Amino acid sequence: MTERADEEGLQRKLRLIRLLHQTNPYPQGPGTASQRRNRRRRWRQRWRQILALADRIYTFPDPPADPPLDRTIQHLQELTIQDLPDPPTHPPESQRLAEA
């Protein structure tokens, strides 16, 4: 089952990367040479950002199989409450002097 989950996770990552690539088509259209050059420059800049983002998506590790909540619950179950000592029957000397 983990192989299937790994494969589904990889397919999901690849679909996301493909979607990112499809959202940035190569610039087409009329205009002066400087307008076309600027459109291509902006496109290359977006393309580099998409490649960096795709690399981060692809290399980002999957969450651990053991959810942190389960580990936290196990840790909490191991905790015990210690018996507290009985409170003193007489107030300390400093409090008695302050009251007088």
UniProtKB/Swiss-Prot annotation:
The keyword RNA-binding applies. The keyword DNA repair does not apply. Residues 22-41, 81-100 are annotated as: Disordered. GO terms for biological process: mRNA transport. It is found in: Host nucleus, Host nucleolus; Host cytoplasm. Pfam families: REV. InterPro entries: REV_protein. Residues 16-24 are annotated as: Homomultimerization. It comes from the Viruses. A motif (Nuclear localization signal and RNA-binding (RRE)) lies at residues 35-49. GO terms for molecular function: DNA-binding transcription factor activity; RNA binding. Residues 22-34 have a biased composition (Polar residues). One of its GO terms (cellular component) is host cell cytoplasm. Keywords: AIDS, Host cytoplasm, Host nucleus, mRNA transport, RNA-binding, Transport. Disulfide bonds: none annotated. A motif (Nuclear export signal and binding to XPO1) lies at residues 71-82. The RNA-binding motif binds to the RRE, a stem-and-loop structure present in incompletely spliced viral pre-mRNAs. This region also contains the NLS which mediates nuclear localization. These overlapping functions prevent Rev bound to RRE from undesirable return to the nucleus. When Rev binds the RRE, the NLS becomes masked while the NES remains accessible. Escorts unspliced or incompletely spliced viral pre-mRNAs (late transcripts) out of the nucleus of infected cells. These pre-mRNAs carry a recognition sequence called Rev responsive element (RRE) located in the env gene, that is not present in fully spliced viral mRNAs (early transcripts). This function is essential since most viral proteins are translated from unspliced or partially spliced pre-mRNAs which cannot exit the nucleus by the pathway used by fully processed cellular mRNAs. Homomultimer; when bound to the RRE. Multimeric assembly is essential for activity. This is Protein Rev. It comes from Human immunodeficiency virus type 2 subtype A (isolate CAM2).
